[in-house]
Amino acid sequence: MAVLALVVFCLCAMVMALTTAEVDPAQQDPDWEKVMKLLVLPLVFAALSFVLTGCTTNVAKPGQVTKVKLKQEGPFKAQVVGVQWLNPLIRRDYPTEWQLLWTLGLSKPNEGDFQVKDKPKKFSSVQPVASIVSNIGQRKSFSSVFWQYMEDVLRPIGRRYVGNLNSFYTVQPDSPKHWRELAGIHVEFAIPARPELNPDDAAQIVRDAIIKEFEIGGRPTLSSRNTPPDVRMTAGGANAGFTSLAAALDYLEAHPQETAWVMTWDAPEHPLDERMTENCVILVLAGPDYDTRREALAWIARPVVRRVRDFDVQPGEPRAVQAWRAAMEAATAGAGRSITDIGYLIHDAGKGRDVSGRRLATLGQVLSGPLPEFNILTQGFNTTALLGDTGAGTALTNVALAIAYAHHRGVPVLVAGTTDAEAAHAVLISPPVRPRVFDPARTWFRARGEGNAYLPWWGLRKDVDWGRYMQGFSE
């Protein structure tokens, strides 16, 4: 609009100047009239054009999806828009944000929590409190448990999808062009490499569950197109999630105006249930130029992998140490940072075995050079030492925990996948510019019914007063 007004001003000034030049000198206007013609009148026309143009500009309506180029600089990173996590250690009444902090040892139950008073031994420390999918009698197959997990992890997002205008994904606004629907959502999924769960069958289970929960292709009032989810499976072990995460970032870079999900699931101790080794995670991601109209929970750079075989033996420096140093340098550089910026480490070295000690020693040796005061025990979190062998769910569970730590402590967190002796896997999670840091003295939101059970963690909208929300509530 400003450019148009400037053009109008210049054209009017030129016309007035030419008109004045062609008049006989004896008939020329007085000086004040010349000023009117050469300056004031063009300004008036320019102002009118500015105002009238502004009247025709579209204004974003509540719920409208705006696509604004944010022009992020530097290496490609993804915004974390939302996180959902299920594990038998989770209490269904506290939100996902609290669950992650509770697991990290950073949050506590509310003062006067009835369950803590009633059963202090069970609810005062991180331990299984209830099964997500019950398998009494151990009769349910691995794929059946997977199917039920998909229903449970999607339901908290689906509850608000239809009926809540403020939900990130919603079909509530009157006009479908203002929807942000889940038809065609791209999903990168890490699952265990087990014969009981074929990747093609698993992908179909996920597609069917998403279609059912969000009524894709159903009534026109709930779905504008019959496009099934685009689900891609990666079957593997503890590092499979890094592969899925890398694929999701590739997709977002190629599709800057879309969102993507990165998911994982495993139940390594099946047919046993209520085990903390069970994890199901959804990371809702968007590219750096996607206007979510929310503050990011954190930023994720590209995962990197460095193979031990690609390095030569050096005196006093094993190839594994070289590979890990290269991986950490690449992971931090991919986030526009350096290795000296690492403020916390989340890893899967485990405990109680010689191999766990070697993993910790390697990580400590690499970090002690650039960060001589870094204490891997006090500045690190050994997830599998607490939860057990979490299988294919390891990498993305660690990323979810890293998002919580980076958000609330304001430091970059390195996630290290140590289980492959022949490769170093790493990714850096960076804190957001505007976090909502929890206050230990404040009461956490708790669900009073199924409507808010297993409440996901979403970045808060930029257009609302955050003070109106209870701590831990987001939608």
Identify the residue ranges that each predicted region occupies.
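Conserved "HGTGT" condensation-loop signature of ketosynthase/thiolase-family condensing enzymes
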Residues: 1-277, 281-475
